[in-house]
Amino acid sequence: MTKTMLNIYRQQTIVQRLSKAAKGETMRAVGGWSVATLVLALCVPTLARAQDQECGDIGAIVRQAYPNAVADGERTMKTGNRTLTLPSPSSINPHAIVCRRWRGRPGLLLVAIPLIAEVGVDSTLGDLDVLVVDEPTGTPRHRLRIPHAMDDDAVRISRISFDTAPYRFGPDRLAFGVRREWVGSSRPNPFMETTLSLYEPRGAALAPVLDDLIVERSQGQWDLSCAGETVVTERILRMVPGQKGQDISVLERITQSTSREAKNGECSTTDQAVAPRTIRLSFDGKRYDVPRLIQRR
């Protein structure tokens, strides 16, 4: 079993266990972890969540954004036929509201509000409301509702987060990112993926600038013991001068790993790096065109 594949499976197992999505499953595959490793694995998502919940009274923001919303539980509210979930510091919930200060625009908050219509055994239906909020007053200044952004099936959305890297593509033009992380439910075919979308405030709205670029992907297949293959793709973004502003240069790195049982019974892994390539995304003055092969559909 490759190291990357094991990490994918371990992360999937933790997410499934903590979200109670793997009822009846055991932690046998991660039983060999040291206490320090387990603590680190559990603390990393906790620290990440803390960064995405730094906006104080989320309830006050929700009340201004949805004045007709009504309480529907201890940490849930209803607006029409949609359910909003307030974040909890003690649990992981990919449907909970996410909030972060926009470092590039002091005084503004970034808020992502999943609007869930239905949660089934193997699927979820819902939209995502993305807001830029005035921090002193909690008043929404820019807003965009993204239909079906929370829809999933056997490949589940495991986390929503903000990316506040300085995506500057013109004079006084700054975008922020929304990342969606996905995780598969199959043990023999582990899968994880992260997509990035960029949004720019325009008037009272938010304009999509970049749609669902796949920035990370890990996928593989193995026999649940040793033999298997994994492909890990990573894409790193850099702003570069273009004809109509700043283009995006995407550095793509791919690593292929193969694992086989050796004659001595040990599991042997071979990693092979594919030659990196660079993909240029041109800015047309309003948005970037993403090739279909590197975009989630």
Language-model segments: residues:
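N-terminal signal peptide c-region/cleavage motif recognized by signal peptidases
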Residues: C43-P45
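Cleavable N-terminal signal peptides
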Residues: T37-L38, A48
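Acidic/hydrophobic-patterned starts of short beta strands in beta-sheet-rich repeat architectures
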Residues: P106-L115, R168-W182, K244-I254
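Bacterial N-terminal signal peptides that target proteins for export
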Residues: I8, L18-A36
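Acidic, small-residue rich beta-repeat scaffolds with periodic aromatic anchors
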Residues: R49-T85, N189-A207, D211-R297
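Solvent-exposed N-terminal domain segments of exported/luminal and surface proteins
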Residues: Q51-L125
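Short N-terminal edge-element motif at the start of the domain
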Residues: G107-G170
